[in-house]
Swiss-Prot record:
It comes from Bacillus cereus (strain ATCC 10987 / NRS 248). The keyword Cytoplasm applies. Homodimer. This is Protein GrpE. GO terms for biological process: protein folding. It comes from the Bacteria. It is found in: Cytoplasm. Residues 1-39 are annotated as: Disordered. The gene is grpE. GO terms for cellular component: cytoplasm. GO terms for molecular function: adenyl-nucleotide exchange factor activity; protein homodimerization activity; protein-folding chaperone binding; unfolded protein binding. Keywords: Chaperone, Cytoplasm, Stress response. Residues 1-20 have a biased composition (Basic and acidic residues). CDD domains: GrpE.
């Protein structure tokens, strides 16, 4: 019986050892699975963080691309405007000379020498106007037209029954446009 007891004790010891080994293996597995889970969670956090950064970077890139496209469009428009209005400075400088030509041509010619001088001035005046017309310069029509503050500068007001209300009655100085831009507004007298 003693042998039997010893054998039972041995079997119990072995079972305890096996149980301890199994428990150790199970606890190692659970530790590994906890570690794996926490490692997986860390990796997922990292992936989420990187995806957020990627999304932010893509958004920033799209905004920069749109800004660059707008910049290119603006530069192109500025270039076209510069080309379109390249003669503006020159035309502005020539306008006083044209005004003086017009005033000089209004003088009455008393003799043949004066008449030929006026004819020469008229030819030069017409050539200047033709050159300016080729560049897109045109005189602003004023007398009889409705007053337009973009094209006319009112220097006087009168009451005249021959004209409509707010119509230009008289032009003191011609106005000019280059293409669609007013270079100098017409100085006018306006009916009330």
């Amino acid at each position: 019986m003693e042998e039997r007891n010893e054998q039972v004790v041995e079997e119990v010891k072995e079972e305890v050892k096996e149980a301890q080994v199994e428990e150790a293996v199970t606890s190692e597995d659970s530790e590994e699975s906890v570690e794996e889970k926490s490692e997986a969670a860390l990796l997922q956090e990292k992936v989420d963080e990187l995806q957020a950064k990627l999304t932010e970077t893509e958004g920033r890139m799209l905004r920069l691309q749109a800004d660059f496209e707008n910049y290119k469009r603006r530069v192109q428009m500025d270039k076209q405007a510069a080309e379109k209005y390249r003669a503006q400075s020159l035309v502005s400088d020539i306008l006083p000379a044209l005004d003086n030509f017009e005033r000089a041509m209004q003088v009455e010619a008393n003799d043949e020498q004066m008449k030929s001088l006026l004819q020469g001035m008229e030819m030069v005046y017409r050539q200047l106007l033709e050159a300016m017309t080729k560049e897109g310069v045109e005189a602003i029509e004023a007398v009889g037209k409705q007053f337009d503050p973009h094209e006319h500068q009112a220097v006087m007001q009168v009451e005249d029954s021959e004209f409509e209300s707010n119509a230009v009655v008289e032009e003191f100085q011609k106005g000019y446009k280059l293409k669609d831009r007013v270079i100098r507004p017409s100085m006018v007298k306006v009916n009330q």
